[in-house]
Regions:
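Conserved HGGG/HGGXW glycine-rich cap/lid loop of the alpha/beta-hydrolase fold
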Residues: 1-29
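Gly/Ala-rich beta-loop-alpha elbow adjacent to hydrolase catalytic centers
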Residues: 41-45, 49
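Flexible "cap/lid" loop of the alpha/beta hydrolase fold
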Residues: 54, 59-87
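Hydrophobic, aromatic-rich cap/lid helix
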Residues: 109-137
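Short beta-strand/loop motif that positions the catalytic acidic residue
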Residues: 141, 147-149
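Conserved alpha/beta-hydrolase "acid-adjacent" motif
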Residues: 154-160
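Catalytic histidine neighborhood in serine/cysteine hydrolases
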Residues: 165-181
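Catalytic histidine-centered segment of alpha/beta-hydrolase-like enzymes
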Residues: 178-191
Length: 206
């Protein structure tokens, strides 16, 4: 089973293109890993997955387009501004502006207001901001990790390279012709690379 931790505004159904059974992890309690489970975290979910992996081992994990938490007053202010907008602003305007952020490179995912609790979205922006959560202790993570970034997502390519250099058991894949939303921009390449990682014995059990 692929245990997914989606990014902000992510839905469990976003992962229906995967050829494996999958289920979304609750963000708060750390999941107990079964012997064949793979943890997959995207963007904000990737940062939360790293927190889980500091204390819970999985057979393998996949981190996609994730940043690294670090104190940042300006980022905290930006996330607070977004949180306030998510509490009350017109949804269509909000989605237009959210998807227009340079990090997404023009790739738009359709999102319907009825699928969300606005108060919960605002809470996530405040509580899971990379400016609020503690920096990950990557050196502590023993789970084998495949870290993925899109080649057009320069900031997150740099983060991925630095993270993989610190992780004890990790490999890096830069996805061609993709930006931040790798799984949905290049789904076939994404699935192919995940399959190779899941089936490989590059990191045998210790």
């Amino acid at each position: 089973v692929i245990r997914t931790l989606s990014g902000f505004l992510g839905l469990e159904s976003d992962w229906d293109f995967l050829p494996w059974p999958h289920e979304e992890v609750e963000r708060r309690p750390p999941p107990a890993a079964e012997s064949s489970d793979v943890l997959l975290g995207y963007s904000m979910g990737g940062r939360l997955a790293l927190r889980i992996l500091e204390n819970t081992s999985f057979p393998k994990a996949i981190i996609v387009s994730a940043g690294l938490n670090a104190p940042d007053d300006e980022r905290k202010k930006r996330d607070e501004a977004w949180a306030r907008r998510f509490e009350s602003e017109d949804w269509s305007t909000l989605m237009r502006d959210w998807n227009a952020q340079p990090v997404f490179g023009g790739h738009v995912l359709d999102r319907r207001e009825e699928d969300y609790d606005r108060a919960e979205l605002a809470r996530q922006l405040r509580e899971y901001s990379p400016a609020v959560l503690p920096p990950p202790e990557l050196e502590r993570i023993e789970t084998p990790i495949l870290w993925i970034a899109g080649e057009r997502d320069a900031k997150y390519v740099d983060i991925a390279k630095r993270a993989v250099a610190r992780l004890p058991r990790a490999e890096l894949w830069i996805c061609p012709n993709a930006g931040h939303r790798v799984p949905w921009e290049q789904p076939d390449s994404f699935v192919s690379r995940l399959r190779a990682f899941i089936e490989s014995n590059m990191f045998p059990p210790r």
